């Protein structure tokens, strides 16, 4: 085995099965690119990203763990978000929640 090597079985794996999702239109109104990681609480992203923040509370990007989405200046794109799991408590990030959702 090589360090970091994967042994993947044939077939498909459904990620985030059964969790609530929402699709939002997100615009970068800033003058610099903004990158958001897979497990960042989307509600608390950079204020230059314009979208329905209330709909994003308790959600993260519905993408593979360890990856990210980049928003170029002036770019608008749709993203799918998925509900956070576990205890549904959020601490850190920008400090906008600091507790239960």
From Swiss-Prot:
<dbReference type="InterPro" id="IPR050069">
    <property type="entry name" value="Urease_subunit"/>
</dbReference>
<comment type="similarity">
    <text>Belongs to the urease beta subunit family.</text>
</comment>
<dbReference type="InterPro" id="IPR036461">
    <property type="entry name" value="Urease_betasu_sf"/>
</dbReference>
<keyword id="KW-0378">Hydrolase</keyword>
<keyword id="KW-0963">Cytoplasm</keyword>
<dbReference type="GO" id="GO:0043419">
    <property type="term" value="P:urea catabolic process"/>
</dbReference>
<dbReference type="Pfam" id="PF00699">
    <property type="entry name" value="Urease_beta"/>
</dbReference>
<protein>
    <recommendedName>
        <fullName>Urease subunit beta</fullName>
        <ecNumber>3.5.1.5</ecNumber>
    </recommendedName>
</protein>
<dbReference type="GO" id="GO:0035550">
    <property type="term" value="C:urease complex"/>
</dbReference>
<comment type="subunit">
    <text>Heterotrimer of UreA (gamma), UreB (beta) and UreC (alpha) subunits. Three heterotrimers associate to form the active enzyme.</text>
</comment>
<dbReference type="GO" id="GO:0009039">
    <property type="term" value="F:urease activity"/>
</dbReference>
<dbReference type="InterPro" id="IPR002019">
    <property type="entry name" value="Urease_beta-like"/>
</dbReference>
<comment type="pathway">
    <text>Nitrogen metabolism; urea degradation; CO(2) and NH(3) from urea (urease route): step 1/1.</text>
</comment>
């Amino acid at each position: 085995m090589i360090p970091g090597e994967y042994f993947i079985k044939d077939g498909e794996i459904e990620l985030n099965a059964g969790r609530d999702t929402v699709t939002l239109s997100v615009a970068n109104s800033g003058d610099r690119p903004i990158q958001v990681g897979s497990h960042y609480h989307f509600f608390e992203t950079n204020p230059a990203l314009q979208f329905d923040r209330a709909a994003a509370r308790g959600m993260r990007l519905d993408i593979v763990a360890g990856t990210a989405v980049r928003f170029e200046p002036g770019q608008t794109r749709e993203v799918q978000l998925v509900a956070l799991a576990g205890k549904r408590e959020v601490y850190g990030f920008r400090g906008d929640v600091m507790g239960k959702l």
